[in-house]
From Swiss-Prot:
Region (Disordered): 1-24, 175-251, 375-423, 506-540, 568-592, 662-773, 822-855
Name of the protein this chain belongs to: Uncharacterized protein C227.15
Keywords assigned: Cytoplasm, Membrane, Vacuole
Keyword Kinase: no
Subcellular location: Cytoplasm; Vacuole membrane
Species in which this protein is naturally found: Schizosaccharomyces pombe (strain 972 / ATCC 24843) (Fission yeast)
InterPro entries: AreA_GATA, Glucose_repression_reg
Entry's Gene Ontology BP terms: cellular response to glucose starvation; protein catabolic process in the vacuole; regulation of carbohydrate metabolic process; signaling
Length: 873
């Protein structure tokens, strides 16, 4: 086969140009050209020519659209590059709407005779198609397949007498007239208004030689490209596929048909070519709506076990592409039903229960299953490229603090590089914290002054290894996003740092520090090995004393003080911090020191009570920050006077539950104290470890231990009865106001047996309040105001019963005497109060020892009976 073009192709171009020149009075407008053969296309040219008249009345030879047919011979000369769209500005003119499809379809494959080949040549109204045509003129067709503004290639046919110039979108381009001999002579052109000028922003075709081996590659390339927007008139044919193959220049000559043109930077620029049209081919990116997920499988929408995220992903895909599925609407509805079932946890009724299984029924509905984690088609290749780049990229090592001695010590640090790379996995023990001390500066300030600390301690961290260790140490103790996770244990390990003047022998110290991974033993000048932590080597070497760690017995959280284990007597270094009993004066309250919550002032404080090593441990004492005083004793007060105006039953509230907290000091002072008028609503027994100064205390001078309550101790006279109930009436306002009474009744045995009522004398708060009272004492209003309980108040069952019987008998006599002498409810016949004992008869049998029925005739008798009943139980 010959590489020269067919003769019919050359004649076609000549004949077309000659017919153009003959129709000077009637400028032509080429609309479309579809030719099954060359002769038919030439004969039909006259039918397609139309006259176009400018707005100023002159006829112009300009063309709005020109299509040149190219007949292909036996070999493929040209291949399709692009179908370029027409700009939006073309649609603003009415005369453009009638134009046919502006496209260029040139394919390297063989076509039938009915194929259409056309190209759109854009230009303006005031520009000429013909300009200075010569015999050796070329046909420059400037294209840019790489989507740039430069004109790269030039294609010429040497036997044509036509030159195509594409003008920029500016007015004033040269126009010319076409003569009969086929030559064009330039002529002046008037400026046309912008409204009368039409600019066609379309691109010219790109031609390149195509080999037989490249046809399949070109075809595959066309199928893989993405469509972009096209002209409104050409909805069906506007999609173009830019080729990825490089374009070349073609020139026809007598010897060789293909001749590459010179590059743009080597060719001299013609002044007539400078206003060439700069085409900007905009490549639009893929829209988010075009992103599709790859459905890997098909599942039954009616019986599949769905996840909520998969339901949303599948439903979104179905709503966009339901037209592509036969059951798209059913799949969409099934997605909604599945989502409602999953959200509200509904149950599914089997078809068998509804007799739904028939021959024509289909109980399945298959559709695409998509997951939210599936990669999309649009980004799948990009993710693969990023993964490859990450795998190929070298790993960047973190920068560490460099000093001036790094290069000098490079040879020395190379041997210990393996040790520096080893991560610090062991957490710092309490022993290390005690020896090295805690960084009292908060972590933000440490980061702020890290550079200053590094300069001041340059001798310690003099190389890269030390800096790495230090950074790793701080990063472990103080993470960037610190969220403390505290795990509590039943037992807490305790230890204490002890300062000693001299260390033991080398063998003992070496065996003592075998389990300390971070401790080092270094010989000193005196031959004594010093045991220190590596991070604290400088500080320990400067100090003259030495520190050792002593283990304390494990403390159990929330445990009583008596249950703590005693320290082993065979301790290696008991020191001055341990008492005779082996118990240390370390705070006995169980405390947990976390890694970041450790404070040295909590380990040993001078103001605590462990200065004297000969003090014995007293389990009945509670130690405070200061010396234990009488103010720190426990006080139990009856602030509400519960036994005066309420019906209380404290059978279950035995005083023995308070005995372990009571004070059993036998030699305490028994001074009298008074209460203020302050009101406190609390339980009958209020416990105060530090009573407020305004709350006084009360006590009884005579304890039931030293005085016996007998019936003979009380007199049946009316004066005695009146004195008792006068006190009762006096204290009644305080009872109603729920305030502690001011007065205290002392039961004293006198020669005549009369009870004397004396007010309490106020005393200082520092006085003792360890006086004791028995719950079996006489039930008066003031006896139970405030008491202090201790183990000495424990009574046996026989003693309590005897005291109770004596109190009952005494109460009966008191009530009888009161009813005989001062009964406010008894009156005589005249209506005046009567003191006659015959007016009120008291049944003696109702008040015997075995009777427990209260006397209902008087409220005072009921009160006494209920109080006695509660004490008796």
């Amino acid at each position: 086969m010959s590489n020269k073009p067919d003769a019919n192709d050359q004649c076609m171009v000549k004949e077309t140009i000659s017919r153009m020149s003959m129709s000077k009075e009637k400028p032509f407008l080429r609309r479309n050209y579809s030719s099954p053969s060359f002769n038919d296309s030439v004969n039909s040219v006259n039918d397609e020519f139309q006259t176009y008249q400018l707005p100023n009345g002159e006829f112009s030879d300009n063309m709005n659209d020109l299509y040149f047919p190219f007949r292909k011979g036996n070999e493929s000369l040209m291949t399709e590059n692009s179908n370029y769209p027409i700009s939006e500005q073309d649609t603003q003119h009415n005369h453009i709407s009638d134009f046919p499809s502006r496209r260029m379809q040139l394919d390297g494959m063989n076509h039938s005779n009915n194929d259409t080949y056309s190209t759109a040549i854009p230009f303006s109204k005031d520009s000429s198609v013909f300009d200075a045509v010569g015999q050796q003129s070329s046909v420059p067709i400037h294209i840019n397949p790489a989507y740039t503004n430069s004109h790269q290639n030039s294609y010429s046919l040497n036997e044509t007498y036509l030159s195509y110039d594409f003008f920029d979108n500016h007015r004033g381009a040269s126009s010319s007239a076409v003569s009969k001999d086929g030559l064009a002579s330039p002529r002046p052109t008037k400026d046309v208004d912008a409204d009368d000028t039409t600019w066609y922003f379309t691109s010219s075709p790109s031609f390149q030689p195509l080999k037989d081996s490249d046809r399949s590659q070109t075809k595959n390339t066309h199928e893989e490209t993405s469509p972009i927007v096209s002209s409104p008139e050409d909805d069906a044919d506007a999609a173009f596929k830019p080729s990825s193959l490089p374009s070349t220049s073609i020139s026809a000559s007598s010897n060789a048909f293909y001749k590459p043109a010179a590059p743009d930077n080597e060719r001299p620029l013609d002044p007539h070519i400078t206003p060439y049209l700069r085409l900007q081919l905009l490549t639009t990116g893929a829209d988010d709506n075009d992103i599709r997920k790859n459905a890997l499988t098909q599942v039954d929408y009616l019986s599949y076990d769905w996840k909520e995220t998969d339901i949303w992903a599948s439903w979104r895909e179905i709503t966009k592409t339901k037209a592509n599925y036969d059951n798209g609407i059913r799949l969409e509805n099934a997605s909604w039903r599945t989502w409602m079932k999953h959200k509200f946890k509904l149950k599914t009724i089997s078809p068998e229960t509804l007799n739904w299984l028939k021959e024509c029924d289909v109980t399945w509905l298959y559709g695409p299953l998509l997951h939210t984690s599936m990669p999309s088609r649009h980004h799948s290749h990009r993710k693969k490229e990023k993964e490859k780049e990450k795998s190929k990229a070298p790993r960047v090592t973190p920068l560490t603090h460099k000093t001036n001695d790094d290069e000098a010590n490079h040879s020395e640090t190379s041997s210990g590089s393996s040790l520096a790379k080893k991560p610090i996995l062991k957490r710092r023990t309490p022993q290390e914290l005690l020896l090295s001390g805690r960084d009292l500066t908060p972590w933000p300030q440490i980061r702020r002054f890290d550079s200053l600390l590094a300069r001041n301690r340059g001798d310690i961290f003099s190389n890269r290894n030390h800096a790495t260790i230090r950074s790793a140490l701080f990063s472990q103790r103080y993470p960037s996003h610190s969220k403390r996770h505290i795990h509590f244990n039943d037992r807490v390990q305790q230890c204490i740092a002890v300062d000693i003047d001299s260390l033991p022998s080398d063998s003992e110290s070496a065996s003592y520090n075998t389990d300390d991974a971070n401790s080092v033993v270094s010989p000193s000048k005196d031959g004594i090995s010093t045991t220190t932590v590596s991070s604290d080597a400088t500080r320990s070497s400067q100090s003259s004393h030495f520190r050792i760690i002593e283990d304390l017995p494990d403390s159990k959280l929330k445990y009583s003080l008596e249950d703590q284990a005693t320290y082993d007597q065979s301790s290696r270094y008991p020191g001055r911090h341990f008492g005779k009993t082996g118990r240390s004066h370390f705070p006995r309250a169980p405390e947990y020191y976390g890694e970041n919550d450790f404070e040295e002032d909590e380990v040993y404080r001078d103001d605590r009570h462990y200065e004297n090593e000969h003090d014995e441990y007293d389990p009945n004492l509670i130690y405070y920050d200061n010396e234990p005083t009488e103010e720190n004793r426990l006080v139990f007060e009856d602030t509400n006077n519960t036994f005066i105006d309420t019906d209380s039953d404290d059978s279950n509230a035995d005083e023995s539950q308070f005995l372990e907290y009571a004070n059993d000091s036998p030699n305490s002072s028994e001074s009298l104290e008074s209460l203020n008028n302050q009101s406190y609503s609390s339980s009958p027994y209020s416990v105060f470890s530090h009573p407020p100064p305004y709350m006084g205390r009360q006590s009884l001078n005579d304890s039931p231990q030293t005085s016996d309550f007998k019936a003979s101790n009380l007199n049946d006279s009316s004066s005695n009865v009146h004195s008792i109930f006068q006190t009762r009436e006096t204290t009644s306002p305080s009872v109603q106001n729920k305030t502690p009474t001011k007065y205290h009744r002392e039961l004293k045995s006198s020669k005549d047996g009369h009870e004397q009522a004396s007010p309490l004398v106020s005393s200082s708060p520092s006085g003792s309040f360890t006086s004791q009272i028995s719950p079996a004492a006489t039930t008066t209003a003031t006896n139970l105001d405030a008491v202090s309980l201790s183990p000495s108040t424990v009574r046996t069952g026989s003693q309590i019963s005897d005291i109770g019987n004596d109190a009952i008998s005494t109460t009966r006599k008191t009530v009888r005497a009161f009813l005989e002498n001062a009964n406010p409810y008894s009156t005589n016949n005249d209506g005046n109060p009567s003191n006659n004992t015959s007016d009120v008869e008291v049944n003696e049998t109702s008040m015997n020892d075995n009777s427990e029925e209260p006397i209902s005739s008087n409220w005072l008798v009921d009160l006494f009976q209920k109080s006695l009943k509660s004490f008796r139980e």
